Amino acid sequence: MSASQPALSLIKSLAYMDGRWCEARGGRRFEVLNPATGQLITQVPDMDEADTRLAIAAAHRAQPAWAALTAKERSNKLYAWFELIMANQDELARIMTCEQGKPLAEAKGEVAYGASFIQWFAEEGKRAYGRTIPGFSGDRRLATIKQPVGVVAAITPWNFPIAMITRKAGPALAAGCTIVIKPAAETPLCALALAALAEQAGIPAGVINIVTSHQAAAVGNELCSNKTVRKLSFTGSTRIGKLLMRQCADTMKRLSLELGGNAPFIVFDDADLDAAVAGALASKYRNAGQTCVCANRILVQASVHDAFAEKLAAAVRSFKVGDGMGEGTQIGPLINAAAADKVASLVNQAAAAGARVLVGGQAHPAGPLFYHPTILTGVAPDNPILQEEIFGPVAPLVRFETEAEAIAIANDTPYGLAAYFYGRDIARVWRVAEQLEYGMVGINEGIISTELAPFGGIKESGLGREGASEGLEEYLETKYLCFGSIA
């Protein structure tokens, strides 16, 4: 491997099922490439429906014994996993940068962020409380208990290849569920590295299973249609989420769906502009704009629009673009050619519809998957770029006059994942926070996700919540007990 792609002991080239490292039954494999360099990292098994059924069966066999452990015993296993993840933070970050492309500093941050979900749910699993209920007659006693859903399927994306796994596996395992994980074909190596560390932590065979595959439709259909799987957790596009939801309907699976976003970022005239610029930079450009909660539309009140645009442009022009392994890199590559083509097309369409390119607006010479960090001004509310999740380092600026206009523009979307706004008038802060139709709102803050708070959206941005106590509830069933003949 090259200097930018070092040999790493946690890179695995086999799938992980039932405590074994294994090939696909048919012997097929697919390549995992470094998006910054185009170099081959390794090949992994290309598993199909039959392989997936084996993984589900392994999870089913392991689930009763795992659920029978006390919450504290499961907690101890999860803590051991958490500690191993943090002990291997540097290597996990290098694997992530190699296969996903994000700058190494961001990758290290994601490893710590991802590990925090394991740590949090190691504790929260001990608090899966039932309750007692006053009876409806003197000889009755009523209570509820919590029990694990059972076998869980998780389909995870490439943009956060560690955190999106731990945010699902942490609560699932803490609740007493077992899990079958289908990571994105672009980033299977982070998932396999996590499995290797889980194995070292003493998590039993069959509790965690990793199905690597380039056959997303076939594997997804098996996970959705198989009666043994009692819950599906998916992070990805709204289009695919709707498809999976339909496929799960026949077996009435529990669902957690974290889907697309179209996040507004509103700057009011009383905002601290320096803080707003810092928030916009963090929210818009991390991971080269490839996050579901990225600021997708930046709405700036007319009286401060030009000053904000000037400050933002100065910062964006200074970004260092390149291989994520490079010293000081701030913007890495897009994940693949389709992503790069989409970003270029959206910028061209926006310009054709009247937007002006203030910064960037073209491919970057670092390589075919790199795009210049871009700012567009003069973007009308009906510009096509405001209707799509950009998933790239492009910030469209929209000028507005009044609070009511900003809220109307912000809510004019079928999505409702995250929103952000900056302002200091306390009355307006409350009004706007309540009127924005989003599951999460950052107020004078551009980075809002944490294991401590419930993450999720409304409208077509999904179902359920991840993180916090709500995240554990997603993997538990409530059973009602009625005791008679007590008197």
Model-derived features with residue positions:
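Hydrophobic face of amphipathic alpha-helices that form TPR/SEL1-like repeat modules
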Residues: M1-A36
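Rossmann-like NAD(P) dinucleotide-binding subdomain of oxidoreductase/dehydrogenase enzymes
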Residues: G130-A275, F400
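Glycine-rich loop-to-alpha-helix module at the N-terminal edge of alpha/beta enzyme cores
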Residues: Q39-A128, D139
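ALDH superfamily catalytic-core signature
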Residues: R239-A380, I443
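Conserved C-terminal structural/oligomerization subdomain of aldehyde/semialdehyde dehydrogenase
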Residues: T37-Q43, V229, I266, K320-V321, ...
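Short, well-ordered beta-strand elements within core beta-sheets of diverse protein domains
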Residues: I41-M47, A62-A68, A154, F265-F268, ...
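Residue-level signal for inorganic ion chemistry
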Residues: G38, A59, R74, M96, ...
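Structural signal for hydrophobic packing residues in well-ordered secondary-structure cores
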Residues: Q63, A67, F82-Q89, A93, ...
